[in-house]
């Protein structure tokens, strides 16, 4: 199902992370880039304080090198690469503010949203000149032209997805594992859509996340930080844009969406009633506080991601 170049992209990106991470972890520890754990988080997370973060830099390096190796043959890889790089830069600045400047919450929410919308609108404005404004709706089995609404709708979906991936990065191996599965499905869809460039970029995501899991699975030796989660979120949705498949990505990334919605519901319900729907949001923390082991929550969420991908596959076949 995967072509030779995509398999090579997976292997190359995987090996880069495996080779670089053993050097990066002690270097991040030397720079005192330790994770700051919030006091209101689950008690079991307090022991994670000081674990090196910003490991997403290695994920990004892996994707960057792999993409550049294939760029001459597949120049359209440059579009999602630049978009992912821009979102990764926001994440890096956010991590820098939290870890180095010791401001625990990082950039202000308003600052991040403005920057994210600026990147999204710029990216969409450029690519729509080449791709047009039509997107594929799987359930309808046809393309729909969004016309003037293309940039407003797609930019909101992009920013929402990027932040949803960021919110999912709260347990050891959760975001990296879910993104590995999503990336693999996107690679397969890209091949069937005859988009080898997007298959290779998706493969780079798969390989880098696979390599990162070696060090991020419970108990994690390193976290990706916002550097990694925002970059991966931007990468995933930019592939969706290039494939004209934003709806499909919202389905296969259903776990991201559920995590984000759990936070939105928690905040809105608390403001209205001063009560909470969940013990804690995002949703993965709710299950932790119900007594589930962290590793169990992660594996169950991986399984649900696979189910979402199978649902998407069934919809495509209808």
UniProtKB/Swiss-Prot annotation:
Q: Where in the cell is it found?
A: Cell membrane
Q: What NCBIfam families does the annotation carry?
A: mraY (TIGR00445)
A Gene Ontology biological process noted in the UniProt record is:
cell wall organization
What are the alphabetically sorted keywords of the record?
Cell cycle, Cell division, Cell membrane, Cell shape, Cell wall biogenesis/degradation, Magnesium, Membrane, Metal-binding, Peptidoglycan synthesis, Transferase, Transmembrane, Transmembrane helix
Annotated Gene Ontology cellular components are: plasma membrane
The annotated pathway is:
Cell wall biogenesis; peptidoglycan biosynthesis
Broad class of where this protein is predominantly found: membrane
Q: Which PROSITE patterns match?
A: MRAY_2
**One function term, GO molecular function aspect:** UDP-N-acetylmuramoyl-L-alanyl-D-glutamyl-meso-2,6-diaminopimelyl-D-alanyl-D-alanine:undecaprenyl-phosphate transferase activity
EC identifiers of the protein: 2.7.8.13
Q: Which cofactor does it need?
A: Mg(2+)
Record has ATP-binding as a keyword: no
- Which reaction equation describes what this protein catalyses? UDP-N-acetyl-alpha-D-muramoyl-L-alanyl-gamma-D-glutamyl-meso-2,6-diaminopimeloyl-D-alanyl-D-alanine + di-trans,octa-cis-undecaprenyl phosphate = di-trans,octa-cis-undecaprenyl diphospho-N-acetyl-alpha-D-muramoyl-L-alanyl-D-glutamyl-meso-2,6-diaminopimeloyl-D-alanyl-D-alanine + UMP
Origin organism of this chain? Caldicellulosiruptor saccharolyticus (strain ATCC 43494 / DSM 8903 / Tp8T 6331)
- Protein function: Catalyzes the initial step of the lipid cycle reactions in the biosynthesis of the cell wall peptidoglycan: transfers peptidoglycan precursor phospho-MurNAc-pentapeptide from UDP-MurNAc-pentapeptide onto the lipid carrier undecaprenyl phosphate, yielding undecaprenyl-pyrophosphoryl-MurNAc-pentapeptide, known as lipid I.
Give me the segments passing through the membrane. 7-27, 50-70, 77-97, 113-133, 148-168, 173-193, 198-218, 221-241, 247-267, 298-318
Q: Which domain of life is it from?
A: Bacteria
Its family? Answer: Belongs to the glycosyltransferase 4 family. MraY subfamily.
InterPro entries xref list: Glycosyl_transferase_4 (IPR000715), PNAcMuramoyl-5peptid_Trfase (IPR003524), PNAcMuramoyl-5peptid_Trfase_CS (IPR018480)
Q: What is the membrane topology here?
A: Multi-pass membrane protein
Task: State the protein's name.
Answer: Phospho-N-acetylmuramoyl-pentapeptide-transferase
């Amino acid at each position: 199902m995967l072509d030779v170049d995509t398999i090579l992209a997976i292997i190359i990106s995987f090996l880069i992370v495996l080779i670089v991470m053993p050097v990066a972890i002690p270097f991040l520890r030397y720079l005192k880039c330790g994770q700051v754990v919030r006091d209101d988080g689950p008690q079991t997370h307090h022991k994670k304080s000081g674990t090196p973060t910003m490991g997403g830099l290695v994920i990004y390096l892996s994707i960057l090198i792999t993409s550049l190796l294939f760029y001459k043959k597949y120049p359209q890889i440059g579009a999602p690469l630049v978009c992912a790089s821009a979102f990764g830069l926001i994440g890096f600045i956010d991590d820098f503010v939290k870890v180095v400047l010791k401001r625990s919450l990082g950039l202000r929410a308003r600052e991040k949203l403005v920057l994210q919308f600026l990147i999204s609108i710029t990216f969409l404005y450029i690519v729509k000149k080449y791709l047009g404004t039509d997107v594929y709706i799987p359930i309808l089995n046809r393309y729909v032209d969004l016309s003037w609404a293309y940039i407003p709708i797609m930019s909101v979906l992009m920013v929402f997805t990027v932040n949803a991936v960021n919110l999912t990065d709260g347990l050891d191996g959760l975001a990296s594992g879910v993104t590995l599965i999503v990336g693999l499905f996107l690679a397969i869809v890209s091949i069937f859509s005859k988009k080898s460039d997007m298959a290779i970029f998706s493969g780079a995501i798969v390989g880098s996340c696979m390599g990162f899991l070696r060090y991020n699975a419970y108990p994690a030796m390193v976290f990706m930080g916002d550097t990694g989660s925002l970059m991966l979120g931007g990468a995933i949705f930019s592939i969706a844009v290039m494939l004209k498949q934003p709806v499909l990505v919202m389905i296969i990334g259903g776990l991201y969406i559920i995590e984000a919605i759990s936070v939105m519901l928690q905040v809105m319900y608390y403001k209205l009633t001063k009560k909470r729907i969940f013990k804690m949001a995002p949703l993965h923390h709710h299950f932790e506080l119900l007594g589930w082991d962290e590793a169990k929550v992660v594996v169950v969420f991986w399984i649900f991601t696979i189910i979402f991908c199978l649902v998407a596959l069934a919809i495509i076949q209808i």
